[in-house]
Amino acid sequence: MKIIQMLPSLAFGDAVSNDALAIRDVLSQLGYETRIYAENIQYKLQGHARAYRRMERTRKSDVVLYHHSIGTDMAFDFEKLSCRKVMIYHNITPPEFFDGYDNRSKRLIVYGQATTKCLADKVDYCLADSEYNKQELRAMGYTCPIDVRPVFIPLLDYEKKPSKKILERYQGDGYTNILFVGRISPNKKQEDVI
């Protein structure tokens, strides 16, 4: 039995990517044969995943974990697999947040919502990042077992020493410095942080 993860993008610092990497590490430590496949692999993470288009054939005994967070044709390939299928639902941002801001992202989000609905009766089990996400899946017709499990956080990242260069640049500069960690996007409400 292999446990394979599929996700659209593996990117440094991304929460979904961190979750996939942490799951891989835990599964490996438990002795499972495990791999990650992604459509896009950021250069910093080359070697941590394989190209999704080169994914090996699965057997009935295998388990595929599909990280769902945006629209991609990968969802339809996942649907067709004959092994055990688990969807890890990371939520899809409501498309209206991107009106007049980023039409490409809005199209991917609308597509993601449609694919979420299409997968409703085609997965064996779901993990949702929150109770809200779980209820969202139920409202879309998911009847399979769904459990809530927050994303894994790479806690060792918090043990790293801060960049001396950055500290020197901002400490004692006479300003109040606000650090926002996340993508720049209307739904992240950077203006509320300020």
PLM-predicted stretches and their roles:
Residues L127, E168-K188, I194:
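Conserved donor-binding/catalytic core segment of Leloir-type glycosyltransferases
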Residues E33-Y43:
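A short beta-strand-loop structural module common to alpha/beta enzyme folds
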Residues K44-K122:
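Extended catalytic core of nucleotide-activated donor transferases of GT-like folds
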Residues P8-L10, S69, V151, N177-S185:
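Conserved donor-binding loops in enzymes that form glycosidic bonds
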